[in-house]
Amino acid sequence: MSDLKLKSWLSIAASIALSACSPNNANKDRQITIASPLAADAVDFQAITGFDIYVDQGNLHAVITAQAANSKQTLIGYLHSEDGGQNWSAVQNIGSAFNLPVESKLGNDIQIASSGKQRVVIWQTTGEIPGMGPLVTIYSNDDGQTWQRGSNPTGAEIDQSHHDLAADAQGNFHLVWLDDREENAYQGLRYARSADAGQHWQLSQTLDQSSCSCCWNRLLVNDQGQVNALYRDMEFRDMALAQSNDSGETWQRLSTVGEFNWKFEGCPHNGGGISQAKDGEIHSVIWTGAENQAGMYHLQSADNGKSWSQPQAVAAGSGAFHGDIAALDSQRVAMIWDAMGPEGSTVMLADSMDNGKLWSTPLLLSTVGISASYPRIVTTKNGWLALWTEQQADKTKHWLSAVIQ
């Protein structure tokens, strides 16, 4: 066992011992293995600047951006796992053939989606103004072995960012992003769909003409052709749900996910997380800065997103900020978040065995004394996979994962 894994096991054992008095001690029997998905010899990919993870038919597909060693170049890497993240393929440099700059970074991450043998990867490149630029699509039709250049969802060279990507059971790829095509000084939430893995895009439309300008968005698709987009609205900076019941052809703003009526003339740089259980229950984790209510909250919907439960505070008073959530089945749900502490930001995990009514005592996943942030969590065949970054002494960020069974 590596020093990293041994250290993580000891940390987890101590955390589990502290959680014995939890009203729902769901994580006490969990087996958690922490390591980096990247091999030690993947030297050029160790300094992570962003990442995304996607689950397709039980297999995991990841894309990362990284600062190349001794270079200002940002690399793009693809890797996959067929055993829930216990073992990963060697990272494949998929960006070098296209020689395009990368503006995507943590909080505005590169994105990946998969459907069968098809993969689509999208990132924000550099346009006329540094720090801004349009989206770039590349795709593979052979399980990620070879890659080709796709098209921009609008064919325009305007600034496009904070995108999310998902594939449905029919092989359609759905994309949302933010842009200011009306040039009215604020961003709108946009959508497009591709039936050929990003070679062409159709149904380009606006879902909301005014949204928060720098918070990430999250897509949720199901087998019935429903597509959901979780995003932060503008007039009140609460999270909102837009929904399509015809595979993206028509949309409506369905609901507010946590009605805090938060008025804020700025951007918190914080989106949310959304997941659907097998029985149809939708779970979400969101953050608000509303006065006397600031913090992270869990909500759930039993009527397909039309209405939501009362917000349930997550680790109240702990500084919980960026969060994600994943429903394994109709009863088991896990949340992950980062929280600011005296020694920097830490990554915490809690899970529920009763569909979100009660949660385990938060469990520390990240390394003690090292600042960790931007966690993600997805379901696997046997549990969950969590991913996050940890900032090292030289200010570079390393990528870590926790296999949770």
Model-predicted regions and their roles:
Residues P23-Q405:
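Extracellular, repeat-based ectodomains that mediate carbohydrate processing or recognition
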Residues S19-A20:
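C-terminal motif of bacterial Sec signal peptides marking the signal peptidase cleavage site
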Residues S2-L10:
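Bacterial N-terminal signal peptides that target proteins for export
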